[in-house]
Amino acid sequence: MQSDIYHPGHSFPSWVLCWVHSCGHEGHLRETAEIRKTHQNGDLQIRGGRGRRESTEIFQVASVTEGEESPPAICMEVFLFLWFIAPIYACVCRIFKIQVRNTVKNSSTASLAPSISTSEERQIRIERHHYHLYGQ
């Protein structure tokens, strides 16, 4: 069975209309009358010729283009948007914080000379002392 959907000035795919109805948006969207003509001849749609059966039904669908959303629906959309964005924001902040820490660790702004351990300092003092003794 093949069906043609006639909208006054609009042509929405049927999956959009099903999605709108299943999500419950018809409460805050203006409903309009729609005429659906169904041509039956096996599984093929016939554009002309004899033996064509046609049935017409009128039913209500939500208009996607017109109507105002209710405040609870707007609040729900904002909540879902923030619920989706929060993990991404936290991940970006964590990556940025790790990058800043690595940059601070690798920079040598505290001292231009490389830091040396206490054992290396002792070795340098001993060598200077011996050099001083041998130099006299």
Swiss-Prot record:
The cellular location(s) given in this protein's UniProt record come to: Membrane
Q: Which domain of life is it from?
A: Eukaryota
Grouped into one coarse class, the protein's main location is membrane
Q: Which UniProt keywords apply?
A: Membrane, Transmembrane, Transmembrane helix
Topology in the lipid bilayer is annotated as:
Single-pass membrane protein
Entry keyword Transmembrane helix:
yes
- Membrane-crossing residue ranges in chain numbering: 73-93
Annotated Gene Ontology cellular component terms: membrane
Protein name according to UniProt: Gilles de la Tourette syndrome chromosomal region candidate gene 1 protein
